[in-house]
């Protein structure tokens, strides 16, 4: 099995044992929904709530997986991220989900089977597009285009556009939806 899938499977087992909902986001999901490309790590988001004790969540994860930062609790409080290393030395970036949009992302996640008998949870193509549109880095924009080309008519455009509209408003970035719309126009013009 691919080392990133091995790391994702290891996290899947642990999170499932602890009844923590999760979804793989980032490059691993982009490979599934878009084109194959190189990625060195695994990105995921896990279910948390404002009432969750961040220290407790961080301690649970860092008791099993090695932290890549010296003070993981403080790092998680500041960035809502936990930087871990799986048993096979693959880096895993764990985002602590916020209520609202990420509740939808986790509820909509789908099973992906990289190897018979081993299913991991991936965010949907729509949610990956939303994540990558908000991030807006050059690789993200390339991923959006490849997902649009590959998934095309399967995409729930209403869902994507509504969440991007909300993020544009919250982030005060009215140009945000255009990152997706540009990719969509290129697809239909091809």
Name every feature range the model reports, one short phrase each:
Residues 1-190:
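Compositionally biased terminal segments of proteins
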């Amino acid at each position: 099995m691919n080392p990133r899938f091995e790391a994702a499977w290891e996290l899947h087992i642990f999170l499932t044992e602890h009844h923590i909902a999760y979804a793989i986001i980032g490059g691993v999901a982009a490979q599934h929904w878009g084109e194959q490309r190189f990625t060195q790590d695994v990105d995921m988001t896990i279910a948390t709530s404002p009432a969750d004790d961040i220290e407790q969540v961080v301690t649970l994860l860092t008791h099993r997986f090695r932290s890549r930062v010296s003070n993981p609790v403080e790092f998680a409080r500041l960035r809502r991220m936990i930087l871990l290393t799986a048993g096979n030395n693959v880096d895993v970036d764990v985002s602590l989900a916020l209520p609202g949009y990420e509740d939808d992302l986790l509820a909509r996640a789908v099973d992906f089977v990289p190897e018979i008998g081993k299913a991991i949870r991936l965010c949907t193509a729509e949610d990956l597009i939303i994540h990558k549109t908000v991030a807006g880095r050059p690789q993200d924009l390339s991923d959006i285009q490849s997902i649009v080309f590959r998934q095309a008519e399967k995409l729930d455009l209403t869902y994507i556009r509504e969440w991007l509209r909300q993020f544009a408003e919250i982030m005060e970035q009215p140009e945000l939806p255009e990152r997706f719309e540009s990719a969509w126009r290129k697809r239909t013009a091809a």
